Amino acid sequence: MSPQTETKASVGFKAGVKDYKLTYYTPEYETLDTDILAAFRVSPQPGVPPEEAGAAVAAESSTGTWTTVWTDGLTSLDRYKGRCYHIEPVAGEENQYICYVAYPLDLFEEGSVTNMFTSIVGNVFGFKALRALRLEDLRIPVAYIKTFQGPPHGIQVERDKLNKYGRPLLGCTIKPKLGLSAKNYGRAVYEVLRGGLDFTKDDENVNSQPFMRWRDRFLFCAEALYKAQAETGEIKGHYLNATAGTCEDMMKRAVFARELGVPIVMHDYLTGGFTANTTLAHYCRDNGLLLHIHRAMHAVIDRQKNHGMHFRVLAKALRLSGGDHIHSGTVVGKLEGERDITLGFVDLLRDDYTEKDRSRGIYFTQSWVSTPGVLPVASGGIHVWHMPALTEIFGDDSVLQFGGGTLGHPWGNAPGAVANRVALEACVQARNEGRDLAREGNTIIREASKWSPELAAACEIWKEIKFEF
């Protein structure tokens, strides 16, 4: 027997399988300021105690495996293991629990969302002892946040670049999303920007397809926004989608956008991946480009209520990885509770500090120290009648994006943009005068439509679609 084997035997190593809770359930643990804290919604299999389920999550997402191993003795598990330190039942749900897990910071590579997620939302989500598992929230410690660049520029720098203050920004996704030639696509961009919007957007599906290669689209869109800028005297932007099949092609597109002198590019951060997104965000800061983020594929991850990951976690991850805008949903037409939840993660995107507030879905107090904020983008099924609600709900630091609500105007693209800009300016002026947008919203829009025929036509075409506060 070798000396090493004798040493291990003498300290009582015993092969076999033991309950996770014996090692990883530690209700007496006091969390550290440097710990990453996670709140998991755990649905154990029948017969599995919640303490064992919570401990299994902590183990399988940190140092644990299914059996005792010799090499446990070659490191300090107390230093590196995750710990399930608190469990509470979910009100109104049978056999569901919120399990709180603390992870030592040394488990994670600095500045890598990819590595953080590989551990925390990795193989543990397929663990047989659990019927379902959902990551509801994360507390990112300041010590870890400071290893990330974060958003390339942030809200204030973007406003300074665009010279636009005191109101939400207006955007429009060009439709149809697929099938237009580059020249016709550029024409639509020009008409909408000339009509008064601040931004137009590539649809997330638009990369470099046979009907419209990326370089042609970039050239025609750049020509369109420069022409619109010259006519309106305002700085304009088009979200040029740099998402590609390889990081090399993505960077090639970002470099060409910079050479054209446009102000902003775009990335699909979930389908493109966090490594690609962080790479692009670093390039954007170094080269003065704003970065618009689309969340295509998010519903695959966050739609189920008891499995996957809540979007607030994806939003926090984006703020670490880097982006100046991100789509956040519209809130319009949602139930009141859902509105509070949505505005909870909107505040997590924008604010420097957010207090714990379970009614808004915020499980942990979160400080972002000097990390710039991200503008939430409200888009999807909105039109001029929604403008008072959107202005009231999202405030100035947001992007309100009307696709069909611009391009569906009966008189064409430019009048559709005019209608949205007039509606927004009317709502902002009314708010600044102290009027209540929640109660007087429809009246404000009707008053503005009396001197704007474009807005009057938009009001008529969408009058049957109502928003209820």
From Swiss-Prot:
GO terms for molecular function: magnesium ion binding; monooxygenase activity; ribulose-bisphosphate carboxylase activity. Substrate binds at N123, T173, K177, R295, H327, S379. GO terms for biological process: photorespiration; reductive pentose-phosphate cycle. Keywords: Acetylation, Calvin cycle, Carbon dioxide fixation, Chloroplast, Disulfide bond, Lyase, Magnesium, Metal-binding, Methylation, Monooxygenase, Oxidoreductase, Photorespiration, Photosynthesis, Plastid. Its main location: plastid. The record marks K334 as: Transition state stabilizer. GO terms for cellular component: chloroplast. CDD domains: RuBisCO_large_I. The keyword Secreted does not apply. The modification N6,N6,N6-trimethyllysine is found at K14. The modification N-acetylproline is found at P3. It catalyses: 2 (2R)-3-phosphoglycerate + 2 H(+) = D-ribulose 1,5-bisphosphate + CO2 + H2O; D-ribulose 1,5-bisphosphate + O2 = 2-phosphoglycolate + (2R)-3-phosphoglycerate + 2 H(+). RuBisCO catalyzes two reactions: the carboxylation of D-ribulose 1,5-bisphosphate, the primary event in carbon dioxide fixation, as well as the oxidative fragmentation of the pentose substrate in the photorespiration process. Both reactions occur simultaneously and in competition at the same active site. This is Ribulose bisphosphate carboxylase large chain. The lineage of its organism: Eukaryota, Viridiplantae, Streptophyta, Embryophyta, Tracheophyta.
